[in-house]
Amino acid sequence: MLSAHGLVKRYGALVALGGVDLEIAPGEAVAIMGASGSGKTTLLHCLAAIIPPDAGSVRIAAPGAPTVELVGMSENERSAARRSLLGFVFQEHLLLPELTAVENTPLPLLVQGVPRRDAEAHAAAWLRALGLAGMEERRIGQLSGGQAQRVAIARAQVTGAPLVFADEPTGALDSHTSADVMTALLDATTGQGRSLVVVTHDPGVAARCSRVLRMRDGHLSVEVASR
């Protein structure tokens, strides 16, 4: 699914990534942990084509599709790759508060030119699958934090992206809601044969993943089997 080799990222004299190698299989959930400043978010951003590394390669091989090399693409090409291959869930859900759940969720499809009626029907199906039946017409401000994150998960999955990146997806939630949201995230990704990469400080979240990787000073220093 994803293969990264020799990733290097520098910010002036600071080496944020010092030559990282990583392989992620289809249907696998991988957690990346580490102290603040260890390089884990920089790694996620390079893997997800949000920022380019200074050296190295990142290849994505979606089932039934040719392998795509993300490094060396123009910004427009990276943007197109993100839309077609990747989904994103962040600690701050980044939903538009003036829109309802069923209006927020299909936005990636609308950008791809899918007719609004079809996009919203597909979005509503994802919202129901994630336990939000009856809440499709509620504005984001009318939802709890956990419900809003479920909308964000639905939005990340609505295009059928084979690989999802989540940066502290439960960081703003209490422990009970965090567990529920993580269950929804896993059901929507690995439960559908898709891959998931999660950056987290929460050992409980990491323990739900197939593998736990630990970042230290820009290197993946430890790999621990989780479940």
Q: What residues fall within each predicted segment?
A:
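Conserved signature/switch motifs of ABC ATPase nucleotide-binding domains
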Residues: R138, T159, Q192
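ABC ATPase NBD coupling module
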Residues: P66-G87
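ABC ATPase C-loop
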Residues: L132, A156-Q157
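Conserved ABC ATPase signature
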Residues: R139-L143, Q147-Q149
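Conserved ABC nucleotide-binding domain
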Residues: G72, R116, E120, W126-G141
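Short coil-to-helix segment of the ABC ATPase nucleotide-binding domain corresponding to the Q-loop/switch region
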Residues: L99-L107
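Helix-to-loop junction immediately C-terminal to a conserved catalytic motif
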Residues: A48
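The feature captures the beta-strand-to-loop junction immediately N-terminal to the Walker
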Residues: M33-A35
